[in-house]
Amino acid sequence: MRHGKAGRKLNRTASHRKAMFANMAASLITHEQIVTTLPKAKEIRPIVEKLVTLGKRGDLHARRQAISQIRDAAVVSKLFDTIATRYATRNGGYLRIMKAGFRQGDNAAMAVIEFVDRDAYAKGAADKARVAAEEQAVAA
């Protein structure tokens, strides 16, 4: 029985999951919005929210903890300098997950995960897809 076991395995080993979540967190912090499957989005949300809380603490130990998880100094500096200051007055709830239909190849449920008050000029993959879809709708 699997009672009391939190988290999803996502058909990956523990090391693969850890690396995947680190890469997804770095991409989400860099682009402020990513498109992924719904289960991955639900799993990455608490990881990134905890990283933002570390960024809000702002001390050296918090920065080292963030670097140990993300392993990209440029992303950590953006987290601590830009994102943490943006959410200085907000107590949690930094991310939103919006369902985005189903992937054509395998019908997997897709989702857009983004920062709540994100920079509108930080164009993520979902923005480019949305703009292309709007242009096709206008042309049709």
UniProtKB/Swiss-Prot annotation:
What Gene Ontology terms for biological process does this UniProt record contain? translation
Example GO molecular function term? structural constituent of ribosome
Q: Does the keyword Ribosomal protein apply?
A: yes
List, alphabetically, the InterPro entries matched: Ribosomal_bL17 (IPR000456), Ribosomal_bL17_CS (IPR047859), Ribosomal_bL17_sf (IPR036373)
Ordered alphabetically, the record's keywords are: Ribonucleoprotein, Ribosomal protein
Please report any disulfide bonds recorded for this protein chain, giving both cysteine positions: none
A GO CC term assigned to this protein in UniProt: cytosolic large ribosomal subunit
Xref: Pfam families: Ribosomal_L17
Q: Which family does it belong to?
A: Belongs to the bacterial ribosomal protein bL17 family.
Q: Which PANTHER family match?
A: LARGE RIBOSOMAL SUBUNIT PROTEIN BL17M, RIBOSOMAL PROTEIN L17
Q: What is the protein's quaternary organization?
A: Part of the 50S ribosomal subunit. Contacts protein L32.
Query: What is the recorded name of this protein?
Result: Large ribosomal subunit protein bL17
Q: Which organism is it from?
A: Rhizobium johnstonii (strain DSM 114642 / LMG 32736 / 3841) (Rhizobium leguminosarum bv. viciae)
Gene this protein is translated from: rplQ
